[in-house]
């Protein structure tokens, strides 16, 4: 959204931004998808080739990371991920080829070793622009760096060397700058993801649902305790 009213009981949105919800999907599940799920979809759409490619996803335990990992694996990418230990078993069960604890000083070296010492063809960074910039040397020639939290202001590597492509993601900016064609693609992606959620092909992050009066407490929990859960409030 590009204006106030995120916590309003009713709000107006353009018809082109609406998605039908399958009957098999709960209201809570439907509400938990668009922001993290479509952000992940946009991030992966920046990568021209995924099948067989080595893709590093940092912050893979976040709600966006959870969707990004699943969608990348569906497209045949060889995924490597950094996340807190509580997410490691789930990531390995999905088929992630290398998992490391981001708090370990050697986490990047561990994932590079898991990739046979080869550079990554793509990196999706869900942590910070500073980390993304620091990861550029781990990206191979003609590789793609996708940042979700901030942008790399200036490529620190020499020109005409690694020839990296730098991408930034801002789902909310589509409300101001997206064309009808882009909205049609985004909504189609959301509809397909909802169908996969209804069939069990895609899984949601853990949901924490509270009544509207609990909103201040839930916002505090997001800031202090967020570990990949998706926080929702019932408005009504």
PLM regions and their residue ranges:
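Glycine-rich phosphate/adenylate-binding loop and adjacent beta-alpha elements
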Residues: 1-19
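Local beta-strand N-terminus motif with an aromatic residue
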Residues: 8, 52, 96, 119-120
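Short loop/helix-cap segments at secondary-structure boundaries that form the rim of catalytic
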Residues: 11, 89-94, 154-161
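Short helix-loop-beta connector
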Residues: 23-26, 48-55, 118
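Mid-domain Rossmann-like dinucleotide-binding core that forms the NAD(H)/NADP(H) cofactor-binding site
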Residues: 31-104
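Glycine-rich cofactor phosphate-binding loops and adjacent beta1-alpha1 units
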Residues: 99-167
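C-terminal substrate-binding/catalytic core of Rossmann-like NAD(P)-dependent dehydrogenases/reductases
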Residues: 158-208
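C-terminal capping/lid region of NAD(P)-dependent oxidoreductase domains
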Residues: 198-208, 216-236
């Amino acid at each position: 959204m590009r204006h106030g009213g995120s916590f309003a009981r009713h709000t107006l949105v353009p018809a082109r931004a609406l998605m039908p919800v399958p009957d098999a999907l709960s209201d809570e599940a439907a509400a938990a998808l668009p922001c993290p799920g479509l952000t992940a979809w946009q991030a992966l759409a920046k990568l021209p080739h995924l099948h067989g490619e080595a893709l590093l996803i940092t912050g893979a335990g976040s709600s966006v990371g959870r969707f990004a990992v699943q969608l990348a694996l569906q497209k045949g990418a060889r995924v490597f991920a950094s996340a807190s230990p509580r997410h490691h078993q789930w990531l390995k069960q999905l088929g992630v080829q290398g998992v490391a604890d981001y708090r370990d000083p050697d986490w990047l070296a561990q994932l590079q070793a898991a990739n046979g010492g080869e550079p990554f063809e793509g990196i999706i960074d869900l942590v910070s622009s500073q980390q993304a910039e620091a990861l550029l040397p781990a990206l191979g020639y003609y590789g793609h760096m996708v940042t979700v939290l901030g942008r790399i202001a200036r490529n620190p590597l020499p020109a005409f060397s690694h020839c990296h492509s730098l991408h930034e993601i801002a789902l909310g900016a589509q409300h101001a700058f997206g064309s009808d064609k882009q909205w049609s693609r985004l909504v189609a992606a959301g509809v397909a993801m909802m169908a996969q959620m209804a069939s069990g092909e895609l899984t949601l992050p853990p949901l924490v649902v509270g009544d509207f009066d609990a909103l201040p407490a839930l916002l505090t929990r997001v800031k202090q305790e967020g570990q990949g859960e998706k926080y929702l409030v019932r408005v009504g």
